[in-house]
Amino acid sequence: MAMTLLEDWCRGMDVNSQRALLVWGIPVNCDETEIEETLQAAMPQVSYRVLGRMFWREENAKAALLELTGAVDYSLIPREMPGKGGLWKVVFKPPTSDAVFLERLHLFLAREGWTVQDVARVLGFQNPAPAPGPEMPAEMLNYILDNVIQPLVESIWYKKLTLFSGKDIPGPGEETFDSWLEHSNEIIEEWQVSDIEKRRRLMESLRGPAADVIRILKTNNAAITTAECLKALEQVFGSVESSRDAQVRFLNTYQNPGEKLSSYVIRLEPLLQKVVDKGVIDKDNVNQARLEQVIAGANHSGALRRQLWLAGAEEGPAPNLFQLLVQIREEEAKKEEEEAEAALLQLGLEGHF
C-alpha cells in the first residue's frame, strides 16, 4: 500500500520514484517544523528536499514525500525513525545494482572533489563523459563503464614499474638499466590506458638523473610519447655495445645444462633482436638465423635436434619464433611422457623382482 502511494505520488509530480522516499505514520498534529527536525535528526548525511505532505486516510496519519537531491548511500536511510507519536515508517524503491554502483561512484568522486568528466580528462579522453545518474540509459551506462570506470580502476590498481635512477651506484634493489627496460616494456604493454597515463606512470618509477632526462625532454616537447621516453633513456643509460660485440654474444650463447630447449630459445631472443637492431642480421633473415643458432647452441641430441636440422636444411622458409616454440614444446612434452612411462615401467619391474 505504501509503495503504491509512493509510485502514484511520484508519477503525479513527475519525480523519479527511485530518487524518492515516503515517510508515513506522522501524527496529524505534527507541524512542518517538527517534521523537518525529525527528518534531519534521522538522516543527517542524506541530502533531500520535501516535495509535499498529505493526510493518509487509511492510516489516519500524515505522509511526506521526499526527493533525494544528491548522491546517496542507501545504507544510511533508515526503515524507521523515532518521531513524535512513535516510530515513523520510511519506504523507498530498492535501487538496481547499476544505480547503487553509480551512486557509490558519485559519492567516491564527490568526497575526492572530482567529477566523472575530471576523471575522463585526466585519463586522456577527448570526448567529455556524461554525468552518471540512476536513470541513465543503458548505452550511456555502457559508455561510462567502458571509457571511464575501467580506466579509473586501471589507474588505481595497476602493476607498477620498479624504480630506476640512472645513478652510477644503483640504490638497494635497483636493477641494471637493460634488465629494468626489459621488465618495464612487458608491464607497459599490459596497461590498457592512454599514452599520457602510461607516461605518467613511467615518470613515477624514475628518480635522479633518469627523471631529469625525461623532464628536460618534456620541457622541449610536451607531447613526447612513452616510447620516445624509453628510447631516450636507452640512449643515455643503455649499455654501449658494438655491433660486433652483440653478434659475438649472440653466437656464443648456448643452452645451459638442465635448461629446456624452449627456455633457451626464449632467452636467446632478446640477443637476436639486439643484433637485428644493430643491422648485423637483416630482418628478412631473422628466422633462419634463430634456427641456426638454436641448432648450434643446443646441447640436446636425438630426434628433436635432427628435426631442427632438417628444418634448416629444407628449401622452404625457416619457422618463425612461435612455430619453432610450438614444435619444440610438443617434442618436450612427448619426451617427458616417454620418460614418465619408462619410470613407471622400471618401478613395475623392480616390484616384480
Curated annotation (Swiss-Prot):
Subcellular location: Nucleus, Nucleolus
Primary residence: nucleus
Regions that span the bilayer: none
GO BP annotations, alphabetical order: inflammatory response to antigenic stimulus
Family: Belongs to the PNMA family.
Name of the gene: Pnma1
Keywords: Nucleus
Tissue localization of expression: Predominantly expressed in testis. Very low levels in the brain, including in the piriform cortex, hippocampus and some subcortical nuclei.
Protein species of origin: Mus musculus
GO cellular component: cytoplasm; nucleolus
Domain of life: Eukaryota
Chain coiled-coil ranges: none
Name this polypeptide is given: Paraneoplastic antigen Ma1 homolog
